[in-house]
């Protein structure tokens, strides 16, 4: 298999900055498509993490933003294809906006320790947003698949701006018809131990302590509104199985039908200038552990 390409972004393609988030980023137009370039901070692995998780999602059949490795003026990063087209009257409504609109007292501006960001509140907001039960079930099932993906790759940054609904306004005769669907999963840079140095990765592999590492991280979704820290992504799925089995169990059964090797093979085509062999071995071991834990939860 050929290596994943590295898209070279040209300055004349830039069409505007993106204010959301903490990292330098901008929109550019390539062949009539809107892409978001996100610069990877030195030594963080944010670029390869985004690419690998996008490929893991593709193999697992989970809807996720299309991501390519990219470079701009010698600065490494990744490029994410826009899934909300303003030319088609499409708008992304972020989770914090949804929760603030349907959960009493929810603070959409709270950036850290937002303990009201719970599975229960997410489910409540979605059920109030969509009057038809079939639509509610479809949205919640899709979100459950995203949370299973988070657990598989150790994504600890599923905060309330990192999921949402794409709304489209269509003019029909004398009325405006609104359609809404779950946005593809996006923003997976905080995954797969990307923040570790290779020395630390090697030590974890040598000690066989990958499970301890996988269970150490705290996510951005909370189990209870009184908790001080978000729940670990693996533990969140366990909570979901107990609280919302109709959504989480099918997501786990779906994952169980995906061969582990296919998920692991997603790292093979990352160029070594972006991801070392030690890092690739670590990521494979990480997913071996999380896949085993998750598939054991499936009936």
Where on the chain are the PLM-derived regions?
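Conserved ATP-binding subdomain of kinase catalytic cores across diverse folds
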Residues: 1-110
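A broad, structural surface signal
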Residues: 42, 51-59, 141, 145-149, ...
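Aromatic-acidic/polar surface patches that form glycan- and anion
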Residues: 46-47, 141-142, 276
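Short helix-capping/linker segments at secondary-structure and domain boundaries
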Residues: 61, 154-157, 293-298
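Short alpha-helical "patches" and their helix-cap loops
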Residues: 66-74, 159-169, 299
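ATP-dependent phospho-/nucleotidyl transfer catalytic cores
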Residues: 86-147, 270
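Conserved kinase catalytic-core segment
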Residues: 119-197
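C-terminal catalytic region of ATP-dependent kinase domains
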Residues: 170-299
């Amino acid at each position: 298999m050929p290596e994943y390409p590295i898209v070279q972004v040209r300055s004349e393609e830039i069409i505007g900055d993106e204010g959301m988030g903490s990292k330098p980023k901008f929109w550019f137009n390539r062949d009539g498509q809107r892409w978001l370039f996100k610069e990877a901070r030195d030594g963080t692995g944010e670029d390869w993490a985004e690419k690998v998780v996008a490929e893991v999602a593709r193999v697992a059949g989970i809807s996720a933003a299309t991501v390519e490795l990219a470079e701009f003026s010698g600065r490494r990063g990744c490029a994410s294809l826009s899934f909300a087209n303003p030319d088609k009257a499409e708008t992304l409504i972020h989770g914090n906006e949804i929760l603030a609109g349907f959960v009493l007292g929810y603070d959409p501006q709270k950036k850290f320790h937002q303990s009201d960001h719970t599975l229960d509140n997410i489910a409540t907001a979605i059920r109030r947003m969509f009057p038809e039960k079939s639509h509610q079930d479809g949205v919640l099932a899709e979100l459950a698949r995203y949370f299973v993906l988070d657990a598989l790759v150790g994504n600890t940054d599923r905060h309330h701006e990192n999921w949402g609904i794409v709304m489209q306004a269509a003019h029909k005769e004398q009325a405006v018809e609104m359609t809404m669907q779950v946005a593809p999963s996006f923003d997976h840079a905080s995954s797969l131990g990307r923040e570790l140095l290779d020395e630390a990765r090697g030590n974890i592999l040598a000690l066989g302590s990958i499970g301890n590492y996988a269970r150490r991280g705290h996510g951005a979704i909370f189990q209870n509104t009184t908790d001080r820290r978000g729940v670990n992504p693996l533990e969140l799925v366990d909570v979901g199985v107990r609280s919302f089995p109709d959504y989480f169990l099918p997501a786990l059964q779906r994952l169980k039908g995906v061969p582990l090797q296919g998920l692991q093979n997603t790292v093979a085509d990352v160029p070594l200038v972006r991801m070392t062999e030690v890092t690739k071995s670590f990521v494979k071991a990480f997913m071996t552990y999380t896949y085993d834990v998750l598939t054991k939860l499936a009936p």
